[in-house]
UniProtKB/Swiss-Prot annotation:
Gene name per UniProt: whiA
Top-level lineage group: Bacteria
Keyword Phosphoprotein belongs to the record: no
Molecular function per GO: DNA binding; endonuclease activity
Keyword Cell cycle: yes
Family: Belongs to the WhiA family.
Entry function: Involved in cell division and chromosome segregation.
NCBIfam families reported for this sequence: DNA_bind_WhiA
GO biological process, one term: cell division
Lineage summary: Bacteria, Bacillati, Bacillota, Bacilli, Lactobacillales
Protein name: Probable cell division protein WhiA
InterPro entries for this protein: Homing_endonucl, Intein_endonuc_central, Sporu_reg_WhiA_N_dom, Sporulation_regulator_WhiA, Sporulation_regulator_WhiA_C, WhiA_LAGLIDADG_dom
Length: 314
């Protein structure tokens, strides 16, 4: 069964985007998952992922935007529980592509770790770059079973700072921390995670997330209410047990007939109905119904009277 994060990424890889915005997405994918090597005295670009749908998207975006032919390779893992690695390899026009995406400088050697201002200055390009960044290094917890958490991993501190800046452009309150010789941008608020999914175009995943969140929050509210009512019920039971204990003490020590008429009346009624509420006791008073506060006052008097006699005996 596919994880929730896999469902999000699958939806993102199926989005159709304008070529200009696709460049921003491709820039993130290559900057975060790409590596350069020398082959026959020229640079070769390898973009690696464990997700075949992401590999196909990188291949398609390169072809659509630069009319270049790249290779799609599969590196099979022999160890158990290890996913295959999918590699998009570009052997020709590598510098042209990387320079256009502002990933390397014109000298072909200097790597730009920051996001170019022409992306950061335009909302739709920012959305596309964040989509690529999530596809390349993002994960999100299953909202049904885990605490709310979404993160994007980046190797470079400057790049991480730009991701935080771009996310907070949409009021997402993104935070950052250091992890595994890299940097993490993360969200922990359910509402902000849903907003981010909307920002990067994962509308269906966002709607599913919101549905789960509503049910989960409702379930938590019901549990809190039940716990509160259980606590109140336990208090009521304990109070009734204490009242009966004190009334029985008064009956056995001084006799209920020796109590004032109003106290005797409520004492006899409580002994007859040990489990009913104060409101119900008030409705059953032989001399006429009285309020819950009136019943509570009389029972408190009986408790004080019993405790007073007990102290005298001690």
């Amino acid at each position: 069964m596919a994880s929730y994060a896999s469902e999000v990424k699958k939806e993102l890889t199926q989005l159709e985007v304008h070529p200009e915005h696709a460049r921003a997405e491709l820039a993130a994918l290559i900057r975060m998952n790409g590596s350069l090597s020398l082959m026959n005295h020229q640079f070769v670009l390898n973009v690696q992922t464990e997700n075949p749908a992401i590999a196909r998207r990188i291949y398609s975006l390169l072809k659509q935007n630069y009319q270049v032919e790249s290779e799609l390779l599969v590196r099979r893992k022999m160890k158990l529980k290890k996913n295959n690695q999918y590699i998009v390899r570009l052997k020709y026009d590598t510098n042209t592509v990387l320079n256009d995406l502002n990933i390397v400088a014109e000298d072909g050697f200097t790597i730009h770790t920051r996001v170019s201002e022409d992306i950061i200055d335009e909302d739709q390009r920012v959305r596309s770059y964040l989509r690529g960044a999530f596809l390349a290094g993002g994960s999100v917890n299953n909202p049904e079973t885990s605490r709310y958490h979404l993160e994007i991993y980046s190797l470079y501190e400057e790049h991480n700072q730009d991701i935080v800046r771009m996310m907070n452009r949409f009021g997402l309150n993104a935070k950052t921390t250091v992890r595994r010789s890299g940097y993490i941008t993360y969200l922990k608020e359910a509402e902000k995670i849903a907003d981010f999914l909307q920002v990067i175009g994962a509308t269906n995943a966002m709607l599913k997330f919101e549905d789960i969140r509503i049910v989960r929050d409702m379930r938590n509210s019901v549990n809190r209410l039940v716990n509160c009512e259980t606590a109140n019920l336990n208090k009521t039971i304990d109070a009734a047990a204490k009242q009966i204990e004190n009334i029985e003490y008064l009956r056995d020590s001084v006799g209920l007939d020796n109590l004032p008429a109003k106290l005797r009346e409520i004492a006899l009624l409580r002994l007859e109905f040990p489990d009913i509420t104060l409101k119900e006791l008030g409705e059953k008073m032989p001399s006429g119904a009285i309020s819950k506060s009136g019943i509570n006052h009389r029972l408190r008097k009986l408790n004080q009277l019993a405790e007073g006699y007990q102290q005298k005996v001690i």
